[in-house]
Amino acid sequence: MRHFFKLGLVSAAVLGSQMTLANDFWSQDRQWLLGDWGGERQQLEKQGYKFTASIMSQAATNLDGGYNDSNTLENAGQLTLGANFDLSKIAGWEDTTAAIMITKRDGNSLTLERIKDPRSTTLGNTQEIYGRGKIWRLTQAWVKKGFNDNTVQFKIGRMGMSDDFNSSQCEFQNLLLCGGQLGKSIGSIWYNWPVGLWGTNVKYQFAPEWTLGLGVYEVNPDNVKTQSNSDGFNLDMNNVKGATIPVELAWKPKLAMFNGLPGEYKVGALYSTADANDVGTVSKVHDSKHSFWINTQQQLTQHNDNAKRGLFVSFNGVVNDKATTMVESTQQLALWYKGPFDSRPNDSIGFGLANYVVNKRVRDRQIATNESRGYYEYDDLASNYVPIQHDELNVELNYTYQWSPAVMLRPNIQYIHQPAGVKEVDDAWVAGLSMRLNF
C-alpha cells in the first residue's frame, strides 16, 4: 500500500507542476509529461539522442476466492530510465545504434500475498511487472550494426532475451498474457526484462517478408540475484554455466484472406548447454535442455482508412523439455480492438486467456513426496505438505484509456482458475489497474 500512495503522490506532484508550466498539458497529443524542454528534446532527437523516462504502476485487489480471501490491495511499480543513440548521426557510423536502460522495481504481488497456496511453486501473476527483485538493474547496454542496407543486423552487449526472440504484444496486466512466454516457464535460463545479460545475435532478412535470427546468451545465475543493487549491475562472467542458443524464423505477410492487413508469424527453438536437473528423479542431471515456440499476431479488421484502428488477435505457445522443466507448455490467446470509439481512437478493449500446463512428472513426484510423509489428501495446515499442481488458467478483460502518449490507464478484471495449479484453492476474481506515465 505505501508504495501505491508514494507513486500517487509523486504523480500528483508532477501533474500539478505541469499544469502551471504548460497550457497544453491536457492535450491528447502531448508526448511527455515533462514537455519538450523548450524544443530541446526534439532537437536532440534530430541529432541522434533520444531520452526516455517512465513509471509503470500495477495495482491489484482480490474480490473473491484464492487461498486467502481476506481483501487487500497490492501494488507493484517500475521506474525506467533510458537513452537511445543514433551513431550514424552522432559519430558517422552508418546504420549503427546503441542503447542503455536502467530500471528499478518495487512493490508486492497480490498473487503471492493472497491468491496462491504459499507452499506451491508460483505459476502466473496478476501483476506482470512484479519479479526479479526490488533492486536497480542495468537492463540494456548494447550496440547494433546494420549491413547490406540493414538486411543483416548484428547486436552485442547486455540485453534481455525476449528483446529479440519470442517477443510478443503486451496489452494486458496478467503475466502470462503479456509478452513472450519462455521467461514464464524456463526462467532459470531465459531471462526477460528487467534482467540484462551478456549476449549477441544476428538477424538476416533474406526476403522482404522473411527474417532468420540466431543468438547466443550466457546462462549465469548471478544475473538473477536480488540481494543488493550491486547484483543488478553484475558484469562479470565468473559463474557462467553454459549458453542458451535460440533460433527463430519470422514471416511478416499481408495476406489476402485478411484483406491485406499486416501479420507476423514466428517459430523458434532453443538449446541450452547448461546442466539441468531432472524434474522427476532426484540427483539425476541432464547436460542440456530445449524448448520450442510459436508467436502469431494478425490484424483482422481495419476501421475505415485508419490502419491503426481495428481488431487484432494473437496466439502464443511454448513446448518445453519434459525431462527438465516443471511447466510442460503454455498457451495464450488474446483479442484486442484498437480505437473502439471515434472519440477515443487510441484506446483499446482487450480480452485474453492464458494457460499453464504442469508436467505430469512433477505432479507424480509431488504425490510421492507427500505419501512418504503420510499425506494422502490435501492438508491445508501442514507446513511440509507439498500442494499437487495441475494446470492454471488466467483470463483478463480490460479497457486501455490512452489519454495521451504520456498517460495510460488500464482498468481490468482477472479470473484465475486453479491458482498455481492447485485444485483445492478456490478460483479467484481480481480487479486491477495499470498506469503508465511517460516523462
Curated annotation (Swiss-Prot):
Gene3D superfamilies: Carbohydrate-selective porin OprB (2.40.160.180)
Keyword entries, A-Z: Cell outer membrane, Ion transport, Membrane, Porin, Signal, Transmembrane, Transmembrane beta strand, Transport
GO molecular function: porin activity
Pfam family, one: OprB
Annotated membrane topology: Multi-pass membrane protein
Domain of life, source organism: Bacteria
GO BP terms, alphabetized: carbohydrate transport; monoatomic ion transport
Main location: membrane
Annotated InterPro entries: Carb-sel_porin_OprB, OprB_Porin, OprB_sf
Gene Ontology, cellular component aspect: cell outer membrane; pore complex
Subcellular location: Cell outer membrane
Leader sequence segment: 1-22
Coiled-coil parts of chain: none
Protein role: Could be involved in the transport of quinate or shikimate.
Assigned protein family: Belongs to the OprB family.
Protein name: Putative porin QuiX
The species this protein was found in: Acinetobacter baylyi (strain ATCC 33305 / BD413 / ADP1)
Phylogenetic placement of the source organism: Bacteria, Pseudomonadati, Pseudomonadota, Gammaproteobacteria, Moraxellales
The encoding gene: quiX
